[in-house]
Amino acid sequence: YEDNMAATIAAFRAGDQPHYSQVYDAGAAIMVAQVKNGVVIGFEEMAEKYGISVDADNYIPGIKNFYADSDGKMVGVPFNSSTCLMYANMDILAEVGIEEVPKTYEEFEAIAQKIADAGYIPLLQSHSPWIWTENFFSRHNLLMTDGNNGYDAVPTKTLFAETDEFVMHWSKVKEWYEKGWYGYKGRAWGDNQAPFTNGEAAFWFGSAASFGGMKGVLPNFTTNPILYWDSVTGGK
């Protein structure tokens, strides 16, 4: 992903840019911001220019808007968008007497000790920059960078330290780790997916791309939206 982004930028500077470039989701804000600089032609703009009929409403709103500018016009074409999901091991939940999968972090905190007492890891996640940074800001409707998240200008700084909700969340993660409610097994994606796949953890935050492989090894699990802080969203 990073190599392709760098190669695309280098090719443009050399005057030998490709007609199209598949850019990963983390680079979307950069591409959207470059429309105003004349580097990128937005998808909807190009479709209108060449008389191509496009109904942007055919896309799931959350995915469409991720690749759109601040006016809601699609700049990129969602091709194989990865979605962050919470996987739940229903056998573990049944064993410890939990009937409902939590929707909020507050609900998770209420059941985490019960899971830990049974000898399981309550929660794992596989990619903090995506799951507990990018998706955290998005799910809680918070700005992650200046420049209106890159929609109005190329971002010059992140707003991590200035965002009280984000600081609170990571303080909670530290607390969960110390209590044994959150497991961290290494930087690699598979380091944290493997304990869930092996039946050692109740919940795992990962990608929709793992669903097919998971079905072949874990008999009883569900996929759910990632958790959110009710105290931040007001239940929305």
Per-segment meaning from a language model:
Residues 19-23, 75-78, 85-87, 122-125, ...:
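Structural recognition of the beta-strand scaffold that forms the well-ordered cores
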Residues 1-59, 91-96, 100-103, 193-195, ...:
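Extracytoplasmic "Venus flytrap"/periplasmic binding protein-like
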Residues 2-3, 25-30, 82-85, 92-93, ...:
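Solvent-exposed loop/turn segments at secondary-structure junctions
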Residues 68-79, 84, 109-158, 201:
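Extracytoplasmic/periplasmic solute-binding protein
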Residues 21, 29-33, 135, 171-236:
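Extracytoplasmic/periplasmic substrate-binding proteins
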Residues 112-114, 154-186:
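Glycine-centered hinge/linker elements that transmit conformational signals in sensory
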Residues 9, 44, 90, 109-116, ...:
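Non-transmembrane alpha-helical segments in soluble domains
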Residues 27-84, 103, 109, 135-137, ...:
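Hinge/lid segment of periplasmic solute-binding proteins
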